[in-house]
Amino acid sequence: MKKTDTNVLKRVEINGVQYEVVRNDDNCLNVEELSEKLTDYFDPYDYVMGDYAYEKVRLKGYYEANNKKATPINNIKKMDDYIKNYCSYGSKIFLIKKIK
């Protein structure tokens, strides 16, 4: 998992939850937009990844590898495979990790 451009944002609060910014390609993370799109569906996840393509953001939740809820499709160790296979070439990616 590569880390990029985390020098601008290190931690953010979204809807009352603290997150660490792990990855933020070209500073694409828009906290205001994310606060509207980050619903309670993502509450159980340890990470939320967003990919921007064609000026739209798509979100996906991931669990830590050691979380008993982790499966091959939501294990954070498989995120790079997801990006390679399902994200548009050149899309900007951000990854935030819930601070517990």
Regions from the PLM with identified roles:
Residues 25, 63, 100:
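A broadly conserved detector of short glycine/acidic/proline-rich loop/turn motifs that flank catalytic sites
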Residues 71-100:
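Helix-rich interaction surfaces within compact, conserved domain-sized segments
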Residues 51-65:
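Short, structured protein-protein interaction patches enriched in aromatics and acidic/basic residues
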